[in-house]
């Protein structure tokens, strides 16, 4: 199946890299913000706005947008916590990291939601001129005592799912807290973690404290949701009311960070496994993508064109995307791969990029 999305936005440790599909194939086209870590980059659904989240280290987080496909960029004031906001009692809240920026689905290209560390969800309806902290989630009674960092100091919102038919219905994925759902635009939230397992907690079935690495919903039937979790791969067919562990009991499809869904088939998904939490590297030093076509009942390895020895690559949670039959993913060691037949065959677009944080088609 062909697609009209012929641009790749690649957020890396040293800038935003652009690839474009031209008559000769996919080619390197441009770079922006050279030398500056771009934690996430994405376009609005209508491609009118490109967004780039940056992590300047000592200088903090910054946010830029472009309304002309990168020809010009405008810096937008990043979301801010109020002086009275606290991560925990006595610990002032301040912006630590921009995890994800999710354009809204309501046709307003300027309407976005931003997930941050230390656990705040922000919303802007005017292209970042004003950001408002979603107080209902920030003030959830579980946050101060039961949310905590997963690989970073504090909890982070890395996944935002908006219901295409009811825009007040939303989900977020939080490391570490779990999946939360709202039906009223963010005023009230409920944890939706039944069936998940957190092996690192005293109570692995705890309602709050789960660690989804990435939460996604099928674009057509959004009741079908998937997550690559710290403790396996999970799927729900009832809008996150109940999760089922679909990891391979004796196979490689288990630990990892990213999960990507077929746009038309709610039973097809791809993951890129790693060894484990303790050993974050390619299994048997061979890069493998796993695909299921039956909702996780079985998984197949896809390795044609991928390195099968002396490979240490892993793929971060936002570093794989799909459009039509075309998949692309980037790795922690700067390798960029693309398949135009749903992963049956892979080609390398680049072996020399910086560490890749995000890959998105536009």
Pin down the residues of each PLM region.
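Extracellular glycan-interacting surfaces
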Residues: 1-362
């Amino acid at each position: 199946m062909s697609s009209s999305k012929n641009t790749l936005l690649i957020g890396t440790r040293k800038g935003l890299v652009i690839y474009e599909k031209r008559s000769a194939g996919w080619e390197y086209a441009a770079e922006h913000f050279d030398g500056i870590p771009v934690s996430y980059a994405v376009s609005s659904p209508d491609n009118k706005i490109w967004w780039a989240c940056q992590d300047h280290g000592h200088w903090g987080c910054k946010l830029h947008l472009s309304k002309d496909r990168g020809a010009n960029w405008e810096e937008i004031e990043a979301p801010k916590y109020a002086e009275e906001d606290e991560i925990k009692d006595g610990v002032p809240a301040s912006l630590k990291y921009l995890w994800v920026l999710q354009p809204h689905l309501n046709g307003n290209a300027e309407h976005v939601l931003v997930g941050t560390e230390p656990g705040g969800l922000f919303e802007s309806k005017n292209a970042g001129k004003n950001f408002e902290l979603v107080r209902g989630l920030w003030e959830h009674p579980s946050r101060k005592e039961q949310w905590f960092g997963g690989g970073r100091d504090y909890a982070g919102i890395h996944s935002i799912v908006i219901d295409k038919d009811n825009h007040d219905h939303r989900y977020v994925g939080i490391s570490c807290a779990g999946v939360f759902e709202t039906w009223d635009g963010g005023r009230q939230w409920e944890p939706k973690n039944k069936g998940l397992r957190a092996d690192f907690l005293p109570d692995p079935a705890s309602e709050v404290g789960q660690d989804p690495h990435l939460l996604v919903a099928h674009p057509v039937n959004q009741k079908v949701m998937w997550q690559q979790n710290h403790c396996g791969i999970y799927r729900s067919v009832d809008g996150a009311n109940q999760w089922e562990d679909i990891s391979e009991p004796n196979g490689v499809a288990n630990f990892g960070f990213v999960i990507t869904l077929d746009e038309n088939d709610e039973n097809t998904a791809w993951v890129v496994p790693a060894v484990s939490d303790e050993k974050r590297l390619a299994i048997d030093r061979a890069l493998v993508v796993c695909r299921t076509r039956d909702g996780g009942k079985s998984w197949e390895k896809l390795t044609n064109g991928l390195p099968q020895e002396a490979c240490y690559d892993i793929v971060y949670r936002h570093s794989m995307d799909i459009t039509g039959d075309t998949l692309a993913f980037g790795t922690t060691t700067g390798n960029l791969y693309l398949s135009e037949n749903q992963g049956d065959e892979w080609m390398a677009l680049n072996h020399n990029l910086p560490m890749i944080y995000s890959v998105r088609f536009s």
